Amino acid sequence: MSERKSNSKAKNTAKKAVKKAYKKNPKAFIIGAIALVLVIAISVAVIYFAFPETWDSIMAMITTNNGGDPDDNGGSNGDSLERGDGELQIHFIDVGQGDCILILFPDGKEMLIDSANYNDDGEIEKRTLDYLDTYITDDQIDYLMVTHGDSDHTYFVNEVIEAYDVDTIYMPFILAEPSNETLQAQVNALEKSKLDMFTDKDTISTKVYAEFFISALSEPDATIVLNIGQFSIETATYRFDFYCYAQEDWANTNLSSAEKKNAISPIGVLEYNGKRIVLTGDSNEINEPMFIEAVGGTGLDCDVLKVGHHGSETSSTREFLDFINCEYAVISCNAEGNTFLHPRQNTLDRLRADNMTLYRTDLHGTVVLVVDANGTLTFTTEKTTTADIWMGADTAQNQG
C-alpha cells in the first residue's frame, strides 16, 4: 500500500474513533473539546506575542507546504490543481517497434512525444501522419518532444515538423555531427545562437538524428527547450512535470552504450483530475533511481505507466514500480519479428506481480486513454486479442 493510501486509511480510523467517543458520552466529549480549543488558543497567543520569531517560522513552514503533508508526496503541489471539465486524451499510436504518443489536453492544446518506427517503414509513417491529421486539425502543434536520439523515436519527427507549425520543441542536449557532408553543411548553416546552446561534449552522428536536428532548429518561431533538469507544462487544471538529467549529469556522462543513450530520456508525470500518468521514453535502471531521488518522499501514487524501452529487461525496475504504484501499463512494441525480443518476460512478470492491467500495441493496436471531468479512466483499443498478453517475446521465441 502506498504512503498516500496509508495516510488516508489512518485519517478514516481517527474519524471513526472521534465518532465513537462522542456517542459514548456526548456531554463529556463536548466539554473536552471546548477545553482543548481553549488550550490551543492560549498556546497560539503565547507563541504569537512572546515568541514572534517562532511564530514567523511556523507560518513560513505552513506556506511552504501549502497546508499539505510534506511526506504525502503528491508531486508538485498536486492538491493545488483545479478540477477540469474537459477530457484529457493520450493516444499510444501503434508504430510497430517504436514510440509515438499524441496528447490532447483538455484546453485544446496538443503534444507529440516521439514519432518513429525502427525500420523507417513508409507505410507506417503514412498511417501515423494520417492519424495525426485526424486529431490535429489546425496544422499546429503546441509541444513536440524527442526523448532521445534513437531512430525508433526520431525517424518521422522531421516530417511532422515539416507538416505542422510547432510552437515549442523539447529535445536532447546533444549536437548533431553527421558523417554525411551535405547534412553537416546544413547543420553548420543553422543559427549560431541556437547551435551555441549545445555545449555538452556528446554528439550523435546518425542521419536520422541530423535530419530531426536540422528541422527542429530551422522551425520558424519555435522555442527550443533542452531536456535538462526539471521543468513543467502547467495550467490551472493539469500539470506535466518532467525529470531529466541535470546539467552535471550530462557533463559526467558519455553516451558510449545503448543503455546510456536511452537513460537521457525524460520521465514525465502528467496529472489531471486526480489521475497521474507516467511517460518514460526509453528510461531504464540508470535514470529511474535519479527520478526517484528527484521526486523524493516515499512514493508517488500514480495510475498509468507507459512502460520504458518497449518492455526491456533493464527498464521498469522493481524499485521504480514500487515507487510509482500504478494500476495500468501500456507497452509500445512489435514482438513479432523483433530482434530485440521486446517486451521481455522478466519485465512482464514484474508488471503482472503488481496486478496491473496491461495493454500492448502489438496485440491491441493503438491504445487511447481518456481521463474525463469526473477523473474516470477509460481505455479503448484498436483491436481485441486472444493472445497471451503476458508472454514475452523472448519466451515466445524459445517456445518457437
Residue ranges and their predicted role:
Residues 1-79, 169, 369:
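Gram-positive cell-envelope targeting signals
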Residues 32, 51-140, 214-301, 365-400:
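Core dinuclear metal-dependent hydrolase active-site scaffold
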Residues 97-99, 149-155, 176-179, 284-290, ...:
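Active-site environment of divalent metal-dependent phosphoester hydrolases
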Residues 151-163, 179-191, 317-321, 343-345:
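Metal-dependent catalytic neighborhoods of phosphoester/phosphodiester hydrolases
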Residues 181-225, 249-254, 290:
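Surface-exposed intrinsically disordered loops and tails
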